[in-house]
Amino acid sequence: MSKLSTTPLSILDLAPMRDDDLGAAPALQRSLDLARHVETLGFSRMWVAEHHNMEGIASSATAVLLGYLAANTSTLRLGSGGIMLPNHAPLVVAEQFGTLAALYPGRIDLGLGRAPGADMATARALRRDRLGGPDDFPQDVEELQRLLGSRQPGQNVIAVPGVDSHVPIWLLGSSLFSAQLAAQKGLPYAFASHFAPRYLHQALRIYREHFQPSAVLDKPYAMIGVPLIAAPTDEEAEFLATSAYQRILALIRGQSLVLRPPVESMAGRWQPHEQQAVGDFLGLAAIGGPEKIRARLEVLLEQTGADELMFTCDLYDPAQRLRSFEIAANLRGK
């Protein structure tokens, strides 16, 4: 039996907007369509990510979007991938996710990151100067653990809802710091290799070598992000991938991140250094037909020992995006 056939598969969604969308509503509806689709395919979980002031990403109000998705699905685990904790008071996060857990018990994850999820001007608009910064992240995680855990004698501040909910906390990151912290706290770890694969192997090694068993986890559990573009043929997948290339190129250039239709060729659309940067961004990508995808994922599992794969997929046509995840799901039976 192949490793892929027994590895949980999950989704990270940013509610991507298209260049022809009139507002965010179509993107949010597509996120729901995706959640319903992957639920039927047997995916383990779907997370949405917090980003601010990024034209083309509609998942900024992460907890609100999770409530919408959870209300319209029945079994799929849903969570944040992640909440950028420096943007929020831990008590507010505990109340939001405590509410979600009360409404949808056993289905909510709380993934936490310490990156801004925004530029400096936006960070100021979020009042981050009043909330502290990334250096406070370990203490903020501990505070969240207390707020979501069992009520302690003499505890003056409680999250209602939230206390006694024990919402599963994941630590997210693309750095060695996050790996070390997840190991120290005995928490599951998700590495952001879908856009920053450079330190993946080093981070996983640190996480596993330094892992300390905890009340929530007795051994390391690592999930890695993988960009996925699957199609019936390698040629079609390469063509469809140009939408992802254009989006990453726009990110590099500081332009709108709305999804654009695929193009026959990227020649003349990027400079050599930009092409290299896009390639680095997608260093872990699985792009191709079913057999190429299967081989790529098996290699990634062998190289990383990942316990779970979390896919991202930037395709312009919603039906082709759903098909991409369907192809990946069908590979588990082979």
Summary of predicted features, one role per range:
Residues L9-D13, M46-V48, L78-S80, I108-L112, ...:
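Hydrophobic faces of well-ordered beta-strands that scaffold small-molecule active sites
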Residues R130-I158, Y199-A306:
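An alpha-helical appendage that flanks or caps ligand/catalytic pockets
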Residues D13-Q29, I83-P90, V163-G173, F281-P290:
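Active-site mouth loops of central-metabolism enzymes
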Residues L9, V38, G42, E50, ...:
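Conserved, mostly hydrophobic/aromatic
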